């Protein structure tokens, strides 16, 4: 993202969301849930790329960066399913999403310590479908893992400030 003008604050955010995504990938791997790790990694790194065009959304709420990011990535030849993470990370509640997209959306919450039960439930349900296990079989280990990732949120927030 640095090559296309991403400010340091956006790069740091992508780094911290990617850190949470790596923790989620490790958790899902421990539970033998099959997913496309490369998709999750790319989505976590690029989900807010549209904030290059909508810089005000780095410090204020807004959704203009979502479609802008998807368009920007598609224009640079990024695979459509990865580019879609620009929208699905924020619109997961209204879109049909693959597990990978839901993991990106969850990483974007957990990095700062935020728990979103409805999103976590969708991740658990999608993960159960991928590994042919019951939702309740996965609930406790995944919920405990989500809690551990969120618990590190304050430390990540402390590292989010750039000079």
Predicted regions and their residues:
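Divalent metal-dependent catalytic cores for phosphoryl transfer on phosphate-bearing substrates
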Residues: 2-4, 33-129
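A positional/architectural concept
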Residues: 5, 9-29
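Residue-level recognition of alpha-helical structural elements
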Residues: 6, 10, 35, 99, ...
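Charged/polar positions within long, soluble alpha-helices
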Residues: 26, 112-115, 151
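Charged phosphate-binding loop/patch that engages nucleotide di/tri-phosphates or the phosphate backbone
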Residues: 135-163
């Amino acid at each position: 993202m640095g090559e296309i003008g991403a400010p340091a604050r956006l790069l740091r955010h992508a780094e911290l969301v990617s850190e949470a995504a790596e923790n989620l990938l490790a958790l899902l791997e421990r539970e033998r849930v099959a997913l496309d790790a490369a998709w999750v990694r790319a989505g976590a790194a690029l989900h807010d790329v549209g904030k290059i065009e909508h810089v005000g959304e780095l410090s204020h709420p807004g959704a203009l960066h979502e479609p802008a990011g998807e368009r920007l990535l598609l224009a640079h030849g990024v695979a459509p399913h990865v580019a879609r993470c620009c929208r699905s990370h924020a619109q997961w509640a209204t879109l049909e999403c693959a597990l990978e997209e839901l993991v990106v959306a969850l990483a974007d919450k957990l990095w700062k310590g935020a728990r979103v039960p409805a999103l976590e439930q969708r991740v658990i349900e999608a993960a159960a479908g991928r590994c042919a296990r019951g939702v309740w079989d996965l609930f406790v280990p995944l919920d405990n893992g989500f809690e551990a990732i969120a618990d590190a949120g304050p430390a990540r927030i402390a590292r989010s400030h750039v000079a």
